Amino acid sequence: MVYTAASPGEAEIIIRRIFASGYPEKIILQDMIPGDDSHMRVLTAYSDQNGKVRMMCLGHVLLEEHTPKGLGNHCAIITEQNLPLMERFKDYLESVDFVGYSNFDIKYDERDGSWRAFEINLRLGRSNNYVTSAGCNVAKYIVDDYILHKKFDGTY
């Protein structure tokens, strides 16, 4: 669930209500990055069993859900390339020897011209069909890596 607050005081009230309802876990607070859905990107990557990134597919989110429980879920995505942005995430994944699929939600912050990652999902994202539509068969990377032991030449 995503909650938004206009001030620190409002955030404190929301947090108190959440815990008062019986929620026992930690809560993550994030800066609200201004901008509409077109500022969002989604990046899906596959890192092989040696921690090397074999595939990256960057999607430009055109439309997100705006229902209370659907907020933040992507509805319409087209692929694009932004090699400097993709390389930053590739470098990160390889620096931590990550293995498997990863999925990042990223938003452009026009306040300072930076890209902000909201999270990393250690799996394919809910909206990962854009990857297959772009020509990257998500099952093939696992088969090539673990069963066929194919060498990799890179796919972005």
Located regions from the model:
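Peripheral (often C-terminal) accessory segments that flank ATP-dependent C-N-forming ligase machineries
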Residues: 144-156
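ATP-dependent carboxylate/phosphate-activation module, predominantly the ATP-grasp catalytic core
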Residues: 2, 6-9, 13-19, 31-97, ...
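A short glycine-rich, hydrophobically flanked beta-strand micro-motif that places a catalytic Asp/Glu
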Residues: 30-31, 99-111
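A short beta-strand motif that forms the metal-chelation/ATP-contact edge
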Residues: 113-123
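Short, structurally constrained coil/turn elements
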Residues: 21-23, 111
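Glycine-biased flexible loop/turn sites that connect beta-strands or occur in inter-domain linkers
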Residues: 51, 112-113
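Short, structured loop/turn "capping" segments at alpha-beta junctions
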Residues: 25-26, 99-100, 152-153
